[in-house]
Amino acid sequence: MTHVPRHLVDAFKDQLARLVAIPSVGAEGRGQAETAATVGELLGDLGLDVELHPTAGAPVVFAERRVPGAPTVLFYNHYDVQPADPLELWKSDPFTLTERDGKLYGRGASDDKGQLVSRMIALRWLEERHGRLPFGVVFAVEGEEEIGSPNMTSYVAAQRERLASDVGFWEFGGVDAHDRPTLVCGLKGIASVDLTLRTAAHDLHSAYGPVIQNAAYRMGAAVASLRDEDGRVLIDGFYDRVREATAAEQRYLEAVPPEDDAIKAEAGVERFLAGASGSEFQRRLQLEPTLNVNGVHAGYGGPGMKTVLPASAMAKLDFRLVPDQDPHEIVPLLRAHLQRHGFGDVQAELGEEPEWPARVDPDHPFLRHAAAALEEVYGSPAVIVVSSGGSGPLHPFVETLNVPMAMLGISYPGSRVHSPNEHIRWHDVHRGTYATVRTLERWAGIGVV
């Protein structure tokens, strides 16, 4: 494997340290302006023309360098991060990049500041290898991904001409639990829903249990009516729009090397829902829509005992969706189900702005270039993942811009993304950055192909 040159390794660490030092926590709405300005400065150092585009929330850093008559590659990344809490579990300051044992620790090291710096270093490396590049470059770096990218769909629609590109790189990627390179081709959509219920004017003494409805029981019954023990959603019409897997997608599902035992060990479970295993496990994980209960709250949850009859209850749900499901149809279907099953008193409201599902054809020529580059760099075939179980604003890039986005990068399952002690490994930085370089060289027909 070719390593990133020493001077670019130093540049990677310096640039990442600058970005990690700014606590751009999306949920708290702080640090966005400073981080956007710093990202813009770093992109400007690459010779790109930089603009900070305002949105209803955090600004988008837009940067471009077009080559007349040549194709263009688009990079999507984000500069916001998750909160660092709980701080006491960090072994070093989350906002000071810290190196130990071949790893770089800090909030955003993997998600997503390290990935962004890796792309920038890859472009510098390419120019050192080939001189002026024979393709254009566009960056769109947002500051609200960690809170659901509420403004990205409208931003892409408004800037579609400025963002027009031929191929693209998504903000994340890396290796699986067996250190095999992955190439992810899609993301699920998501609709977050809040359920609320009130059965009395205020909490009561539990002595009223024989005669007054308990909101906790009722909410539990309502939630239990939504899916069966194997995870099958019981809402009428929920699966009507689900797109059947193509022959190619089914082929890639069946080709995924077994990872059942590794995931069971990591999750601490003995059995998957419905006893799924092998390709059926992958089909469910990648291609099935789901209903998940994020949390339920009612009554007293403190120490000791409080004999209370809860008068209200709430539940937070998320629906992970697949093509061609419409996230805006979920709440009407859910309300109809609740009404039909005698839970008309349970209110359902859409939470955060939903995200649509999207997929790229695994056999698209650009993804084939990426797969070939990954096999070359890592020494083993890329694991083609038809769709991640996670979500993100992929839909406007794939559907509005019609850009095939490749998902590869510098992370690994142990990176502690969204958790204390988030980090990346140096050898993943070398491999992931070089994979970006080789993908672009293969696509552009430069260097050894």
What is the meaning of each model-derived region?
Residues 75, 98-148, 193-197, 208-229, ...:
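Alpha-helical metal-binding/catalytic segments enriched in His/Glu/Asp
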Residues 82, 177-178, 234-312, 320-333, ...:
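An extended, acidic, His-containing surface patch that forms the Zn2+-binding/catalytic region
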Residues 8-9, 89, 131-132, 184-190, ...:
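Short glycine/proline-enriched loop/turn "hinge" motifs that connect secondary-structure elements
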Residues 79-81, 140-149, 171-176, 199-202, ...:
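Acidic, glycine-rich active-site loops and adjacent beta-strand->loop/helix elements
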Residues 110-186, 448-449:
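Acidic/histidine-rich catalytic neighborhood of metal-dependent amide-processing enzymes
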Residues 110, 201-203, 208, 319-327:
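A generic structural motif
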Residues 2-109, 126-135, 317:
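Acidic/His- and Gly-rich active-site-bordering loop/insert found
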Residues 182-198, 406-410:
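Flexible glycine/proline-rich, aromatic-decorated loop/lid segments
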